[in-house]
């Protein structure tokens, strides 16, 4: 039987704006600001480190004096030091601000649970959605908090990618075309594969709920006497083990699907790097580059491929986290069957 797929209600851009509104509502507007500053600092660290050696070689090649070489080293090393210091400081400083935003969402979920009407509170689909929303806000690794970290990583990769692309514009139009084609192919293939978890989230939630139910009942002090008297321990263990095996099979299916994402990434990265090195070496042997330009472009090719993979990887991560945010939004925005306010008081 063909499984029915469910399209996400909100896209990544809509969820980004929604998270910005949540940060503002929690009086934590500094969270996105910290993310942008750290992205700029980390991008500056990589770019200044990349430019340091080629600029020194270029100064020597141009016959520059010692003072100019020393000034070049001082400027680039200073930028590298400042950007590294800012990145190190912002590694842990914004953590509590991100926690505040996540806890604000937790409070909204709890409030929704407490005030929803009885028909919704007894609806199995609503209860399943509630459980998924709670799981999406359980810890620091959940989308409600990790979204900011991965958004910063995406901004870092995107900024670095643009700079390295500008550095390679003087190489070959065919090279840039090949990079664009392989990038587009990788993005659209991975986009389809990475949505597998969202399309099967109901199946995973059902298995997790069953395991939690059996575990809670087995640890219940109220039912402990009946479990011992009627010898129910082997039966409970059998039910739990059966459900655990089913969940392991589900995880194995998921990882097999995600494995092909890594295979496609590796294949397209090999093609992309091979083409880049071929065009770069051919242009160098034809005499179109000096020593400094060759070193700069040679370093930029590796950094370009790395940041391109970073953009794609973080975009895939953000899309998966966006799917988790869709679950939270769907639960918080459930329409009530009754009008909960605005009525007239009873006489």
Model-predicted segments: where are they?
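Juxtamembrane helix-loop junctions of ABC transporter transmembrane domains
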Residues: 49, 53, 82-122, 193-197, ...
């Amino acid at each position: 039987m063909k499984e029915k797929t469910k399209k996400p209600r909100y896209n990544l851009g809509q969820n980004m704006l929604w998270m910005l509104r949540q940060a503002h509502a929690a009086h934590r507007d500094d969270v996105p600001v910290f993310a942008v500053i750290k992205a700029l600092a980390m991008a500056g660290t990589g770019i200044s480190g990349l430019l340091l050696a080629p600029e020194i070689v270029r100064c020597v090649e141009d016959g520059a004096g010692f003072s100019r070489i020393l000034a070049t080293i001082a400027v680039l090393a200073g930028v590298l030091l400042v950007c590294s210091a800012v990145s190190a400081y912002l590694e842990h400083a914004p953590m509590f601000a991100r926690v505040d935003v996540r806890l604000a969402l937790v409070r909204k979920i709890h409030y929704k649970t407490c005030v929803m009407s009885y028909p919704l509170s007894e609806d199995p689909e609503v209860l399943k959605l509630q459980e998924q929303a709670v799981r999406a806000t359980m810890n620091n690794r959940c989308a409600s908090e990790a979204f900011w970290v991965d958004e910063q990583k995406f901004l870092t990769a995107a900024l670095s990618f643009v700079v390295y692309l500008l550095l390679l514009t003087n190489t070959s139009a065919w090279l840039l075309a090949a990079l664009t084609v392989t990038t587009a192919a990788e993005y659209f293939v991975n986009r389809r594969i990475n949505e597998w978890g969202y399309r099967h989230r109901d199946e995973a939630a059902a298995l997790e709920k069953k395991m939690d139910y059996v575990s809670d009942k087995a640890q219940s002090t109220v039912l402990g006497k009946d479990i011992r008297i009627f010898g129910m321990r082997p039966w409970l263990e059998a039910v739990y083990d059966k459900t655990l095996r089913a969940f392991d099979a589900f995880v194995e299916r998921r990882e097999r699907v995600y494995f092909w994402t890594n295979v496609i990434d590796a294949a397209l990265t090999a093609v992309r790097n091979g083409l880049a090195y071929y065009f770069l070496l051919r242009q160098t042997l034809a005499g179109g580059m000096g020593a400094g330009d060759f070193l700069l472009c040679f370093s930029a090719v590796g950094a370009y491929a790395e940041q391109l993979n970073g953009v794609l990887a973080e975009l895939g991560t953000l899309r998966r986290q966006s799917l988790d945010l869709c679950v939270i939004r769907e639960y918080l925005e459930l329409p009530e069957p009754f009008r909960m306010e605005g009525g007239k008081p009873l006489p």
